[in-house]
Amino acid sequence: MEQVIGVIGGSGLYEMEGLQDVRSIVVETPFGAPSDEFVTGVLDGVRMVFLPRHGRGHRLLPTEVNYRANIYGMKKLGVTRIISVSAVGSMREEIVPGHIVIPDQFIDRTNATRANTFFGNGVVAHIQFADPVCADLSADLYAAAQEAGATVHRGGTYICMEGPAFSTRAESNLYRSFGVSVIGMTNIPEAKLAREAEICYGVIALATDYDCWHESHDDVSVDAIIAIIKQNVAMAKSIIRNAVRRIDRERNCPCASALRYAIITDKAAIPAETKERLDLIIGSYV
């Protein structure tokens, strides 16, 4: 199987030195339109697929992102691994704005307005999500960040809030009491849907601020976030480039068979319309 690596993040990530045969592709999905056109290319002999999570020009709120269409589109284009590049607030003193975190856990504080599963409409599945990121991909991202010269923290918990408003000070301190490392607004349900689609998922989290808990630092603001992101875009590209060289073509992780024992609905009971709609996701099992 051809290795195809997806990157979900800012719209500037695909403007990468060495990316060849760059094309924009409109992808239709049963779940509506993705955030924007997908950008494909070849980097060091590996096919890449990029998607600006919030659309070009940052048009979509975290709540408005069509996560199902985005992940389905990645699957349709043959992606087997997704690298998520995300701006986050630091919830720990030692994670300084400008540092990189490769989280390995999530806490979901989003609400029911986000569609967080491909299933329903006559088919029931329960994926294992105890370890929500791909350990192999995350290890490659950590090594790639070290190689790029980043100050990088391995592991930690990303708490995903609904937004779009930032936290109150009371909320920020509550989340710190949970022992989380960073806070963001986008990686859930993205990670859940990637697991349902049997796509490996790993995160490059760019710490931009201390949210609003740190008494010695300014509270989080959009202008501060943008300033740090601009500083870190080159670093994120370097990490991605290094990771692409490291990632094995073959997958030996459980992500590739996440649905093997997850679907509990009798095959004969699944409506034909649902089977057709989810054929790309469940076709090999039903």
UniProtKB/Swiss-Prot annotation:
It catalyses: S-methyl-5'-thioadenosine + phosphate = 5-(methylsulfanyl)-alpha-D-ribose 1-phosphate + adenine. The record marks S167, V222 as: Important for substrate specificity. Substrate binds at M185, D209, Y210, D211. GO terms for cellular component: cytosol. GO terms for biological process: L-methionine salvage from methylthioadenosine; purine ribonucleoside salvage. Gene3D superfamilies: Nucleoside phosphorylase domain (3.40.50.1580). One of its GO terms (molecular function) is S-methyl-5-thioadenosine phosphorylase activity. Its EC number is 2.4.2.28. Phosphate binds at S11, R53, H54, S86, A87, T186. Keywords: Glycosyltransferase, Purine salvage, Transferase. Pfam families: PNP_UDP_1. Homohexamer. Dimer of a homotrimer. PANTHER family: S-METHYL-5'-THIOADENOSINE PHOSPHORYLASE. Belongs to the PNP/MTAP phosphorylase family. MTAP subfamily. This is S-methyl-5'-thioadenosine phosphorylase. It comes from Geobacter sulfurreducens (strain ATCC 51573 / DSM 12127 / PCA). The lineage of its organism: Bacteria, Pseudomonadati, Thermodesulfobacteriota, Desulfuromonadia, Geobacterales.
